[in-house]
């Protein structure tokens, strides 16, 4: 059990640091587009979870520590629904209703499409 906990922890640290770095970089370059960082990591995370899920389906021998470290740890740290929700509320509170609705729709449907695309890539 300890190796599994360590794998998830290490993946979580790596994913969280990547999300933090992405947010800092986007906010430094496009401060008025704060929501872009969350959108980017969520879409990329959805693509990656599709790819990993597809790979793990055809490679059942991949150890649970690797699977959990990447999916639960890394992608769990990288992606975030709570930040998406806060970004949407901030846009609504600033009166940018159309942008908030577009952002929410793109996040949900873009995430679903990216997950499907990632899974499909593993079937080529």
From Swiss-Prot:
Annotated TM spans: 1-21, 38-58, 69-89, 97-117
Coiled-coil spans in chain: none
One GO BP: cellular detoxification of fluoride
Chemical reaction(s) catalysed: fluoride(in) = fluoride(out)
Domain of life: Bacteria
Membrane topology of the entry: Multi-pass membrane protein
Pfam families: CRCB
InterPro entries, alphabetized: FluC (IPR003691)
Binding residue positions for Na(+): 76, 79
GO molecular function terms noted in the UniProt entry: fluoride channel activity; metal ion binding
Regulation of this protein's activity per its record: Na(+) is not transported, but it plays an essential structural role and its presence is essential for fluoride channel function.
GO cellular component: plasma membrane
Annotated localization: Cell inner membrane
Keywords: Cell inner membrane, Cell membrane, Ion channel, Ion transport, Membrane, Metal-binding, Sodium, Transmembrane, Transmembrane helix, Transport
Predominant place of localization: membrane
Family from the record: Belongs to the fluoride channel Fluc/FEX (TC 1.A.43) family.
General function of this protein: Fluoride-specific ion channel. Important for reducing fluoride concentration in the cell, thus reducing its toxicity.
PANTHER family attached to this UniProt entry: FLUORIDE EXPORT PROTEIN 1-RELATED
The protein's name: Fluoride-specific ion channel FluC
Gene name, Swiss-Prot/TrEMBL: fluC
């Amino acid at each position: 059990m300890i190796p599994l906990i360590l794998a998830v922890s290490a993946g979580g640290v790596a994913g969280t640091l990547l999300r933090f770095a992405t947010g800092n970089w986007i906010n430094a370059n496009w401060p008025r587009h704060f929501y872009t960082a969350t959108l980017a990591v969520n879409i990329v995370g959805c693509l990656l979870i599709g790819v990993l899920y597809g790979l793990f389906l055809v490679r059942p021998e991949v150890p649970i520590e690797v699977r959990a470290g990447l999916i639960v740890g890394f992608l769990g740290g990288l992606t975030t629904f709570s930040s998406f929700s806060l970004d949407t509320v901030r846009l609504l509170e600033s009166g940018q209703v159309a942008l908030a609705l577009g952002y929410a729709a793109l996040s949900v449907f873009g995430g679903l499409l990216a997950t499907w695309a990632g899974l499909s890539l593993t079937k080529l």
